[in-house]
Structures are given as C-alpha cells and as structure tokens.
Amino acid sequence: MMNLFFSFMFCMMCSSLVGASEGPLVKLNNGVQYQGKTEHDGDSFRGIRYGQSPEGVLRFAPPLMYAPPTDGIIDATKLGHVCPQSSCTNTGCSEDCLLLNIFTGKNATIQAVDSGNLLPVAIFVHGGSYMSGSGNLYPGGPLVNFMDGKGIVVTINYRLGALGFLGSSQLRAVDCTYGSTANMRI
C-alpha cells in the first residue's frame, strides 16, 4: 500500500505537465488514473479511497485494502463523505468515508524530482477526540504554501467514535492485535 501511495505522490508531481486546462491527470504504475483539479495555489486530488467501504458486514471489522479499478478515470475533484459523528446532520456523512485528499503546491514540479530533490510530505490527521472532525475541513493549499509551494499535503478521513475505536472481547476474537475496529492500522 505504501508503494502505491508513493507512486501516486510521484505521479501527482508529474501531473502539472498533463491536462492543464481540465486539471491534472495522474496515471499510476498499476494503470489507475485520477483526474484532479487545478486551483490558485496548486493541484488537488480529493476523495481518494484508501480502504474498502466499511459498511454492512465490514462495519466493525478491521479496514480492508481497496483495489481501485484500472479502467477509466477516477474523478478526484470533489471532497468525499465525512465519517458519521454527532454533528452530522446533512447528507455529506456516510460510513463510506475511508478517503483522503492530496494537495500539491504550484512549485511542486517534475523538475524538483528530476534534480534529485525530494519534496516534503505533510500528513495531516485531524483531531476531535476520536469523535468528530474530518480531513475535508482543512484545505491543503494554504498548508502547502507554508512550504513555499514545493510540497505535498495529505488530509485523511477515518472512522470515528464506536465505528472506529470500539473495543470488545468479540472484536478481540476477530483481531487479537488491537481488540478494536483497528483504526490504528490505518
């Protein structure tokens, strides 16, 4: 999964050369393509799935890796669902929320990689006492600007409350490592 993540990050840096009028198009080594969005402070890829939807029988199960389709282009221009929480009163909340957002600065280009300079990557995990919040609330563009536009910011949505941090003997029987829904693995 980490190789896929870093491949995606590298391809995002290359994306400024492709599809400038419609936003960046990234093609990973495994054939998966993501259509991003160009904004005033850089490029963004939003609502990228990193785990299978934890609905139904997977509700309290440890997260499972997601295998994206390799045909077609995945729209990564819109924010995904927020994980259920007490403050959710709109239709933007869903258990299908294991999503992340990736932002690159306008100075994060292929030239930086070609010259052997690695770009900094900041992974922002929101707070909220494991009960509330979302990576969608934090725009990555301003955070990238703190790196002079030469970096990458990742924000993440993760299961909250009992759906993400419930512990019990029944769950321990399924996954003795954590005895919970295993958000700690993500």
Describe each model-derived feature in a short phrase.
Residues 1-12:
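Classical eukaryotic N-terminal signal peptides for Sec-dependent ER targeting/secretion
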Residues 183-186:
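Extended, hydrophobic alpha-helical segments in both membrane/secreted and soluble proteins
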Residues 14-179:
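Non-catalytic accessory segments of hydrolases
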